[in-house]
Design a protein with these regions (language model features):
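CheY-like receiver
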Residues: 1-11
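… and, occasionally, acidic/histidine-rich disordered N-termini of signaling adaptors
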Residues: 12-200
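Hydrophobic alpha-helical signal peptides and transmembrane signal-/tail-anchor segments
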Residues: 212-213
Length: 214
């Protein structure tokens, strides 16, 4: 390297290093936000076992799940994935969580709640940003889960006898369409659960990992 080239080389190197450090800091912030807003404990329901886990990849996205106690042996259950990565996805995840916690006790129809979330998200989110989500209300006394699927991965139900089924209910992602189209394109469904049945909700991290290894 010629000496006269050094001044041009050093600033570029420093700029690249600063950019890398900034991205690392953003990743740490996004991971901290994600951990903070995931449930730290799960309220117990009589006769129902509930568990959740989130293991972030190297690049934190907008994966989100929640369990919100509604009293009377009922619980609101949500799982979603905000498009994008990093701080922006984490920010919109906090927005979604805030809306769900504000409305879950007031709106007992999962479809209508998602419709309101869709309206608020479209009004506040950057154009092109969306959320895939399953939101439902689990009534332990009835062993019923009434839910709506807004463009999210289909729920997997494994029955006690070993039979399995994918619940491919129709639905449009939150933030994709206006309220009229969202309501027309999304349906509410009630799943009847028997003793020993298992319902599995997940984000696309599971499917991406499956394709990566297999």
């Amino acid at each position: 390297m010629r000496k006269k080239d050094l001044p041009d080389y050093v600033p570029t190197y420093i700029e690249d290093q600063a950019k890398e450090q900034r991205l690392d800091q953003e990743l740490e912030i996004a991971q901290a936000v994600q951990k903070t807003f995931l449930p730290s404990r799960v309220e117990k329901l009589t006769g129902i076992d509930i568990a959740g886990i989130c293991e972030p990849a190297q690049e934190t996205g907008g994966d989100y799940y929640d369990m919100i106690s509604l009293g009377k042996n009922r619980m609101a259950i949500a799982i979603g994935d905000v498009s994008g990565k990093g701080i922006q996805a984490a920010f919109y995840m906090t927005f979604v969580k805030g809306v769900l916690h504000s409305l879950s006790a007031l709106i007992l129809s999962p479809l209508e709640l998602l419709n309101q979330l869709n309206r608020l998200f479209k009004e506040n989110a950057t154009r092109g940003t969306f959320v895939s989500m399953i939101y439902g209300i689990l009534e332990a006394d009835k062993r019923e889960l009434t839910f709506a699927r807004a463009g999210h991965n289909p729920m997997l139900v494994v029955r006690a006898n070993g039979d399995a089924e994918w619940l491919m209910t129709k639905g449009i992602g939150v933030g994709v369409a206006n309220s009229l189209l969202f309501m027309k394109g999304t349906e509410e469904y009630t799943l009847k659960l028997n003793e020993g049945d298992v319902a599995v909700l997940y984000t696309d991290g599971i499917t991406e990992m499956f394709f990566f290894f297999f």
